[in-house]
Amino acid sequence: MEGETRPWGRYEILSDAQDCKVKRITVKPEQRLSYQYHHKRSEHWVVVSGIAHVVLDDVDIELGEDDSIYIPVGAKHRIKNNSKTEDLVFIEVQCGTYFGEDDIVRITDDYSRE
């Protein structure tokens, strides 16, 4: 299965079709993804295990196992794992016209990525 390790954890690509892309994302304890948005895709997140702390357009939301959230195109968002010991695992379904990693516009990033 194709995937990539990142400073905050790892993702695996479960499906990569022309009209959608599906990833299984694991966020290590006390890590978070960048605060970002996308020009060409929306995202649906479903929590598999752990507690997700989501920021969506500056609003804080907590999601537990089996909870989900929709991230519209252009919406600023981030997800964080506040657990000190357990991984956060969620499924991300991307819908849109382009799914390249270069459609990530980072507003803030703990790892100084652009």
Locations of the language-model features?
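Glycine- and acidic-residue-biased ligand/ion/polar-headgroup-sensing regions
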Residues: K40-H53, D57-D58
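A generic "binding-loop/recognition-motif" signal
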Residues: P29-Q31, K40-R41, V59, A75-K76, ...
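Double-stranded beta-helix
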Residues: M1-T5, R78-E114
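Short beta-strand His + acidic residue motifs that chelate non-heme Fe in jelly-roll/DSBH
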Residues: S34-Q36, V54-V55, I71, H77-K84, ...
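Short acidic-glycine-tyrosine-enriched beta hairpin
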Residues: D58-K76
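Short beta-strand segments
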Residues: L33, V59-I61, D103
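A short glycine-rich, His/Asp/Glu-containing loop-to-beta-strand
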Residues: M1-Y37, R41
